Amino acid sequence: MEALGKLKQFDAYPKTLEDFRVKTCGGATVTIVSGLLMLLLFLSELQYYLTTEVHPELYVDKSRGDKLKINIDVLFPHMPCAYLSIDAMDVAGEQQLDVEHNLFKQRLDKDGIPVSSEAERHELGKVEVTVFDPDSLDPDRCESCYGAEAEDIKCCNTCEDVRETYRRRGWAFKNPDTIEQCRREGFSQKMQEQKNEGCQVYGFLEVNKVAGNFHFAPGKSFQQSHVHVHDLQSFGLDNINMTHYIQHLSFGEDYPGIVNPLDHTNVTAPQASMMFQYFVKVVPTVYMKVDGEVLRTNQFSVTRHEKVANGLLGDQGLPGVFVLYELSPMMVKLTEKHRSFTHFLTGVCAIIGGMFTVAGLIDSLIYHSARAIQKKIDLGKTT
């Protein structure tokens, strides 16, 4: 018993008799309010604990031979699909021929509404054409290439064949109305029909994981003396409006919390024949989910530059939208982890203890203030 008596001396929470305890309405109000606040803070702490936290780490990128997937969704409200060409090139300026892609071009009217329900698949480096029904012609025919014949191409049975032979020779395709194949297929009429239309380009590219660029530009593209050029003879430079809206542009799959800085970017061309350049720094990223799933993707930063590409009015260049990307030698690794239970427990204890302490101070202040006021009132009555 003596030992228990000595143990009681260490009690930090001495109790008073029930008869000496005073319960007030103010104390009840403070208790209810503090209880609700305590519950709210507890739920907030619980929600925070149930979410995962992401730990970033930085490594040297040692991956080799991987492909880079580029997701594209860009609208050109004043550039018809029949005029628009898309090309992908590597850092040396050579066209990437081993590019896997799945790009589509959707015609849009002047209000941005799709002209047809189905988009047409686009081949890199080619503009959109409509080929005449071959069943109505002699399958064994051999039509003229108008002086552009080559060793491997002796016959040009379609307008596209003629354009291809001209492209190979580096000749400008100036007047399609003088080409029988183009007249038959209604090449000029189609260009005229789409004159006031826009175009949406969407899909993806899979290119080699090296620095390079892809671009959207008017005209037929071809290589001339190892230089990538576009034939703009069919277009007046004053009519090339490269206003564009980038709905989405990313390099790889999305992961939780990713920010693609070019998404929903609207750029209005201040004048005709503008060249827009986006200089992109791609950072390889590995995202490891808490369930063990590994997602290999990329994030990027970007800087934009624009200039007039008309040689008569400004700097040399090609009107269009160019995305020039290079890859960082560093890799970011993002790892999802569960939050610490001890941290959650500490937070809960801090909430409970803090609320009890603050509520006790407020209750004591209210109680003693009320007693002091009551004493003054009683003193005034006696005098």
Curated annotation (Swiss-Prot):
Membrane topology: Multi-pass membrane protein
Residues found modified as N-acetylmethionine: 1
Stretches assigned to the Cytoplasmic side: 1-25, 363-383
Site-annotated residues for Ubiquitinated: 8
Transmembrane segments: 26-46, 342-362
Family named by the database record: Belongs to the ERGIC family.
Record's protein name: Endoplasmic reticulum-Golgi intermediate compartment protein 3
Species for this entry: Pongo abelii
